[in-house]
A protein has these predicted regions:
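Non-heme di-metal
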Residues: 1-137
Length: 137
């Protein structure tokens, strides 16, 4: 178990885990509303990535605290009837997540944790690009 001078890190990780659950749920629900199979597949893929991020953050949390993270609560985000509004909002949220994860990465000392966060923020960048593509379709 690592100790970190910044005791806010475990709380941040729990918050980000909750965000990942909410994001996964949002993309899963959004995917179920679209008619185009390719759009549905992209949205389901993003949802699966968010679930993967949750699991990666869970491992980091457990390594830092020595405790199991049990985050199951999240506030479901409301879907708009207008898919473009959903996509537009999510692009900015994905880009904000990139910044959050990069900041967290710099606060961690273990290389494997930094590698996990690099993968997560790279995925979030890819999500923003995919959502922008869908918006332009």
């Amino acid at each position: 178990m690592d100790t970190y001078p910044n005791q806010y890190i475990p709380k941040l990780i729990l918050d980000y885990m909750s965000d990942e659950l909410a994001d996964s749920d949002f993309y899963k629900r959004l995917a179920s509303t679209v008619k185009e199979k390719d759009v549905e597949e992209i949205l389901r893929g993003i949802s699966m990535d968010e679930e993967k991020h949750y699991k990666m953050l869970e491992k980091i949390y457990e390594s830092i605290t020595g405790q199991k993270a049990n985050v199951t609560d999240f506030t479901p985000e409301e879907l708009s009837d207008n898919i473009f509004l959903n996509l537009d909002k999510r692009v900015m949220e994905e880009l904000n997540a990139v910044e959050n994860y990069r900041s967290l990465m710099f606060a961690l000392s273990e290389q494997w944790m930094r590698d996990y966060l690099t993968e997560i923020y790279t995925d979030e960048q890819n999500h923003a690009a995919k959502l922008s593509f869908l918006y332009s379709k």
